[in-house]
A protein has these predicted regions:
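N-terminal membrane-targeting hydrophobic helices
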Residues: 1-224
Length: 224
């Protein structure tokens, strides 16, 4: 699936979930702000494809994408599990601040074209990562939210986990599948055979969004 398909499908799914839990959500005893999770899920939906040199993140992190096999370790349940543990353990404001800073920097690296980690020495690279408008704006917004609502940090990690997990689930509908049982098995599992950049991906997109719209209508009806 392309990045646009992953982001659109994952964000739409999380948006309906947030609509269903707009008054708040408890995730294993941890307070979650669903709409904060929607935003971070849109970022999380792109992260697994850091192993593709042509992807937005892969271009930023060439040293990773060139040495990683596509649909390898990033398409297992390892990262979502780590994010799950982080979500359950991030209960202090200091931890929330650290999470906000890291996600803000990540957003800057992903969406600011001026951040090129292939150029300059280590100090130039650090400057480019830290000093960019999109990254700084994201960081400031997240930090403000952290002080207004202490649940922001956990919500960010929860959203990243959901976005990453949805990406993997969506790729299970691709003919190449994912090694979700790694390290117990390296075999790729798939439940359908839709192909990337093929008319069948468009069909997958329509079916997914159609199902999301139906779910949204059911949620709205139950709330009336």
């Amino acid at each position: 699936m392309t990045g646009k398909t992953h982001v659109t499908c994952s964000t739409a799914t999380m948006a309906v979930f947030a609509l269903a839990h707009k008054s708040g959500y408890q995730f294993f005893g941890v307070d979650i702000l669903p709409w904060v999770g929607v935003i971070s899920a849109s970022v999380g939906a792109l992260l697994p494809d850091i192993d593709i040199p042509q992807s937005r993140l892969g271009q930023k992190f060439k040293f990773l994408s060139k040495n990683m096999k596509h649909r390898g370790i990033t398409h297992t349940l390892l990262a979502p599990t780590i994010l799950l543990l982080g979500t359950l353990s991030i209960k202090t404001r200091n931890a929330c601040i650290v999470a906000s800073l890291l996600v803000g920097l990540l957003v800057g690296m992903m969406f600011d074209a001026r951040v090129d980690l292939r150029k300059g020495n280590i100090f130039v690279k650090l400057k480019n990562i830290i000093v960019n408008k999109k990254g700084l704006t994201s960081t400031v917004v997240l930090l403000v939210l952290t002080f207004i609502a202490p649940a922001t940090g956990a919500s960010i990690l929860w959203g990243l986990m959901c976005g990453w997990t949805l990406h993997i689930f969506e790729d299970l509908f691709n003919s190449k599948g994912c090694p979700i049982l790694y390290p117990f098995s390296r075999g790729h599992i798939h439940i359908a055979s839709f192909k990337t950049r093929h008319w069948s991906e468009g069909l997958f997109f329509l079916l997914w969004i159609g199902g999301t719209i139906i779910w949204a209508l059911i949620v709205i009806k139950t709330q009336l």
